[in-house]
From Swiss-Prot:
The keyword Cell inner membrane does not apply. Residues 29-154 form the EamA domain. Pfam families: EamA. The keyword Lipid metabolism does not apply. This is WAT1-related protein At5g40210. It is found in: Membrane. Keywords: Membrane, Transmembrane, Transmembrane helix. The chain crosses the membrane at residues 11-31, 42-62, 74-94, 104-124, 140-160, 168-188, 200-220, 233-253, 266-286, 289-309. It comes from Arabidopsis thaliana. Belongs to the drug/metabolite transporter (DMT) superfamily. Plant drug/metabolite exporter (P-DME) (TC 2.A.7.4) family.
């Protein structure tokens, strides 16, 4: 029964993570469209995360009433604040990177995320690696295959990525820095959720931090351009509303998933966004679908399922170990997996 509940939960996490990658590509496309119309990326962040915070307020209220949570101490708030500051930095880098380049390049650069997250998780002992175990070998090889697949999609038959245009280089550099910080944020997120296991509350504090930091940055960056704050009834308004909703939901799902599966599992879905972006541009924008996109997509899929298999194998071993080490095969196991 417990095993069935865990499998059902893992299925929901898997589905939710795939959906968030689709939404992430959509958000990046909207941000590119809005900034092309003259809307400042800093202002997009301020408005969207303020709107997202307002949406989360009633959910936070019900979260406090519906479950028993630990006291929200100053130390925990500082932990959430650090997470919010890191998120502010990578969001500013990311949205400006998209402004200088494109959503496709943003998806392409995300392939550095699994590698950095995996390395950092091993260094800080949040992920165990034993090359004598098939599960560990599968995770390592799956990570490498996914990154290779992402690079194939990006570089094979992709002359635009080799352009010497300065804006494209600036955009790529900003996006690379963004995904390095995203890797760091996953580890901080896992630590934060361990101390305060409420995805909604953590997301609310995260949103407020981004809105405040970006408001300060926007006042400095756009002090001579008051028109940058004007929201028109066109794609700019749609971008602010959609980004506020999707980014808040995206982060709630991420914090929930990282508390159950760890930061490496979370990062492994990033290469999927490249495949999603390639297919989306083919369907909606009429761009050519090259052999490199197909080959890279196959490699990403193989690597993705290898890591999932490795994680599932480890989870199964943990469950069996918990059963065998417990004098009672019911109560302790149930206590371990309450969420």
């Amino acid at each position: 029964m417990v095993h069935g509940r865990l499998c059902n939960r893992d299925g929901w996490i898997l589905t939710a993570m795939v959906v968030t990658e689709f939404s992430n590509v959509g958000v990046n496309t909207l941000v590119k469209a809005a900034t092309s119309k003259g809307l400042s990326p800093f202002v997009v962040l301020v408005y969207s995360y303020t709107f997202g915070s307002l949406l989360l307020l009633p959910l936070t209220f019900f979260s406090f009433r519906s479950r028993s949570l630990p006291p929200l101490t100053f130390s925990i708030l500082c932990n959430m604040g650090i997470l919010g500051l890191i998120a502010s930095a990578f969001q500013i880098l990311g949205y400006n990177g998209i402004k200088y380049s494109s959503p496709t390049l943003s998806s392409a650069m995300s392939n550095v995320n699994p590698a950095f997250t995996f390395i950092l998780a091993v260094v800080f002992r949040m992920e165990n690696i034993s090359l004598g175990k098939k599960s560990s070998v599968a995770k390592v090889l799956g990570t490498i295959l996914s990154i290779i697949g992402a690079l194939v999609v990006t570089l094979y038959h992709g002359p635009m990525l080799m352009s010497s245009h300065s804006d494209w280089i600036i955009g790529g550099g900003l996006l690379a820095l963004q995904y390095i910080l995203v890797s760091v944020s996953y580890l901080v997120m896992a630590h934060t959720m361990g101390r305060y296991p409420s995805a909604v509350v953590v997301t609310l504090v995260h949103n407020v931090c981004i809105a405040v930091v970006c408001a300060f940055v926007s006042l400095l960056a756009e002090k001579d351009n008051p028109k940058a704050w004007v929201i028109r009834f066109d794609i700019t308004l749609i971008t602010v509303v959609a980004t506020g909703i999707l980014n808040s939901g995206y982060y709630v799902i991420h914090t929930w998933a990282v508390s159950h599966k760890g930061p490496v599992y979370l990062s492994m879905f990033k290469p999927l966004s490249i495949l999603i972006a390639a297919v989306s541009t083919f369907i909606f924008l009429g761009e050519s679908l090259y052999l490199g996109s197909v080959m890279g997509g196959i490699l990403i899929s193989i690597g993705f399922y290898m890591v999932l298999w490795g994680k599932a194998k480890e989870d199964k071993v943990d469950i069996i170990g918990a059963i065998e080490s417990s004098p009672s095969h019911n109560a302790p196991l149930l206590d371990n997996f309450k969420s």
